[in-house]
Amino acid sequence: MGLYRIRVSTGASLYAGSNNQVQLWLVGQHGEAALGTRLWPARGKETELKVEVPEYLGPLLFVKLRKRHLLTDDAWFCNWISVQGPGAGDEVRFPCYRWVEGNGVLSLPEGTGRTVGDDPQGLFQKHREEELEERRKLYRWGNWKDGLILNVAGAKLCDLPVDERFLEDKRVDFEVSLAKGLADLAIKDSLNVLTCWKDLDDFNRIFWCGQSKLAERVRDSWKEDALFGYQFLNGANPVVLRRSVHLPARLVFPPGMEELQAQLEKELEGGTLFEADFSLLDGIKANVILCSQQHLAAPLVMLKLQPDGKLLPMVIQLQLPSTGSPPPPLFLPTDPPMAWLLAKCWVRSSDFQLHELQSHLLRGHLMAEVIVVATMRCLPSIHPIFKLIIPHLRYTLEINVRARTGLVSDMGIFDQIMSTGGGGHVQLLKQAGAFLTYSSFCPPDDLADRGLLGVKSSFYAQDALRLWEIIYRYVEGIVSLHYKTDVAVKDDPELQTWCREITEIGLQGAQDRGFPVSLQSRDQVCHFVTMCIFTCTGQHASVHLGQLDWYSWVPNAPCTMRLPPPTTKDATLETVMATLPNFHQASLQMSITWQLGRRQPVMVAVGQHEEEYFSGPEPKAVLKKFREELAALDKEIEIRNAKLDMPYEYLRPSIVENSVAI
């Protein structure tokens, strides 16, 4: 018995407060006490109560709360509740960070992370089971398109659980920026509707100056071979390039190309030959836009790494050879300038298609969605891995539903301007699923497989490895607090169910691609959880943040190509202009690139979340060390970038978002 001091924290978003009454109960190991005091939670405020409890409750296990309403259910966003018992006892935190709706009773467990094995008396077992049962009703698996990895069920935003929706500041920013982009598009369309574009400089009419210094650099230098090669190392899509171990079988040399073959073999022997192969686009159905057939290629680019770190193209093949036909032409830097430029435009357009669909949408957004749904279905809020990973899952479901209803939907942006639209994008996503290997989501393995370890001019590779290592140590710190032995890992049924749900259900049998169906050791847990967090943070940032820089100048990343790939080398400026997107397609590409690629004013940098899901000093110390290491990496990148002609920013912790939220 004695006096209890209770603090209740309400979120700061616009509608977080409530005019409904909230009643509280304290649940301890030896009893339960209803608190007669009721409160009206105010937005952004902490409310403090002092309540005399007549009986001894023992160690506190839960705070229960119920919001009552007579006429209107006014939802309340509760951050947390803390309780300090009689005397000078420690303050006990009960994290919530969710909306409280309706009249039901919500139980919040004390914030210490606990596995099933950490609860031998079963004090939390009923709560775990009931919470997961309710979550499995809210978070159901859906299948947007047959043959793809699974997604959350629900075709519209209103189908999502309320806790997955944008808070007001995020929603307003997203919708206002979209309206601004579309309004600008309408203005540019009206100004250019009767204009015939004849020169590459005409793309300046839809280029947004002042948005990105690097974008302006791309506009001025996009024709240069050095910038073309640089993008494979450090551009918007740095995950295609690999070091050659042999000359690709598809690279058929027509008569008279013996010198080229010898040059390639020399670079191969020296370990300086690299390739970017877009064979995945072969056979993909090209879009038809307003009755006009669009076109796709499946290029191969062979590049050489020079001693100064520059990556320069040696040859471009735009199509795969076909039986019974002459070998496709090989385009060279020594070809007529327009022929070589057009070949590079085809490569850039192909890279754009694969980047947005495979690297960004599939491997970033949709993979993160699998992690979100599996986590919500399999890990209760008291589980330490849930507490560790939940900050990195914020807003992912809403941004993905918006993508499925606006970008890749029927008559969406892809259908309007992308050469892979009109069904080709779905076909490509299905085929790309075969390349979702476990190792490809883990930079130490992926970079080794692609031969990029030790390439000094690959800043993506260097920064990805450093960020992965920092996240791994963070995960390792939390895992070591809760799993003292490998047996504890094997004996955690919730952890094993979560792993299996991701691999077998969400990823549709990905054990054939190296994903685990069970976790047998602490090292395996650390590796798997690090993969999840890195996918939702660093890897998504590396393929998202470069869009405004590299795609604003449309000729550097054409969303579609209006003429077939060339089979001769007699291209003219007229050929190039007739092939590149028209003004409406280019304007819409610019508008969407700005909206999605701009630096987000409402964002949380990796590791900087305000939510505190763990109680106790040990997890807080692990998080503090994580933040210190992130700050040190950020400073190192800043110092390095100051010496570079083109700074590489996309994996700076201060601009890497904490989740897939845009």
Curated annotation (Swiss-Prot):
Pathway entry: Lipid metabolism; hydroperoxy eicosatetraenoic acid biosynthesis
Localization per Swiss-Prot or TrEMBL: Cytoplasm, Cytosol; Cell membrane; Lipid droplet
Recorded topology in the membrane: Peripheral membrane protein
Binding site for Fe cation: 360, 365, 540, 544, 662
Catalytic reaction(s) noted: (5Z,8Z,11Z,14Z)-eicosatetraenoate + O2 = (12S)-hydroperoxy-(5Z,8Z,10E,14Z)-eicosatetraenoate; (9Z,12Z)-octadecadienoate + O2 = (13S)-hydroperoxy-(9Z,11E)-octadecadienoate; (5Z,8Z,11Z,14Z)-eicosatetraenoate + O2 = (15S)-hydroperoxy-(5Z,8Z,11Z,13E)-eicosatetraenoate; (5Z,8Z,11Z,14Z)-eicosatetraenoate + 2 O2 = (14R,15S)-dihydroperoxy-(5Z,8Z,10E,12E)-eicosatetraenoate
InterPro entries for the chain: LipOase, LipOase_C, LipOase_C_sf, LipOase_CS, LipOase_Fe_BS, LipOase_mml, PLAT/LH2_dom, PLAT/LH2_dom_sf
Annotated S-S bridges: none
Domain Lipoxygenase intervals: 115-662
Keyword Hydrolase among record annotations: no
GO cellular component: cytoplasmic side of plasma membrane; cytosol; lipid droplet; membrane; plasma membrane
Name the UniProt record assigns to this protein: Polyunsaturated fatty acid lipoxygenase ALOX15
Organism: Pongo abelii (Sumatran orangutan)
